Amino acid sequence: MSKLSGKVAVITGGAGGIGRAAGKLFAEAGAQVLLVDINEKALNEAVNYISKDKVSYVAADTSEPDEVKRFVDEAVRLYGGIDIFLANAGIEGELNLIIDTPLEMFDKVMAVNVRGVWLGLKYIMPEMNKRGGGSIVITSSTAGVRGSSMMSPYSTSKHAVIGLMRSAALEGSGMGIRVNTVNPSPIQTRMMRSIETQRLEVGGQTFSTVEDIQEATAESSPLKRYGEPEEVAKLMLFLASDDSSYCSGGVYMVDGAVTAGRTS
């Protein structure tokens, strides 16, 4: 039997990168998958890429309560309930010093990266409780376990969802709901490309091209490379499945030992 046979998974930020990779892996493992993203064109492409038979989508803003209620209701209408929630929607914001970051940018990042996750938990946990439990996986980041210069809103948000995860893991324990975070970086995604492009723009003469930044980033990793979205998705599949039945409240790094320390 497939790992997720008979399960229903909701994946936010599902139109590309890690979310799309997880959607494909979850569907291949037997789950019915509802992808959620604000980009409807990319969602349609993701569904065609994965499987029209196993995957549906809802275009929604995950930071708005009515929008979250709408995609939760749609998952229940289509599939009868929710067993797995991958809270993956997130934005990086604009790179800047704290003193130069507009309050509006801070609020925007926190709305998507923290409020959106909290709303998902608020409306999905009751549905999981009706089915006797479930698994929630929240995408954090290496920026959630250490500081990140020029990215204070993003780093703050990724620290915050770890605290949120731990609270949800405690509250969910009585409902049979497990909650964990996955903390990736550097991963070959659109968000990573955006961060690298912004670093080039604000980095003065340190780097000449985005390729220079990518080379330096890969070289700084103990494994000397970027991770791929599929490598992150494989851990998410483990945490979503019953194979991880005693895993809850955990922070799982997918970073090629970047946060482990220095090699020399």
Named regions from a protein language model:
Residues K3, E92-L95, M236-L237, S248-S264:
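Short C-terminal tail/terminal secondary-structure segment
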Residues N96-I98, P102-K108, T217:
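Substrate-binding pocket helix/loop in short-chain dehydrogenase/reductase
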Residues K3-L34:
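Canonical Rossmann dinucleotide-binding motif of NAD(H)/NADP(H)-dependent dehydrogenases/reductases
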Residues L121, S157, M165:
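Active-site helix of classical SDR
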Residues P126, L170-E171, S245:
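Alpha-helical segment proximal to the catalytic Tyr-Lys
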Residues S173, R178, C247-G249:
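Short, small/polar-rich loop/turn modules that mediate ligand/substrate recognition or access, typified
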Residues S141:
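Residue(s) in the substrate-gating loop at a strand-loop-helix junction
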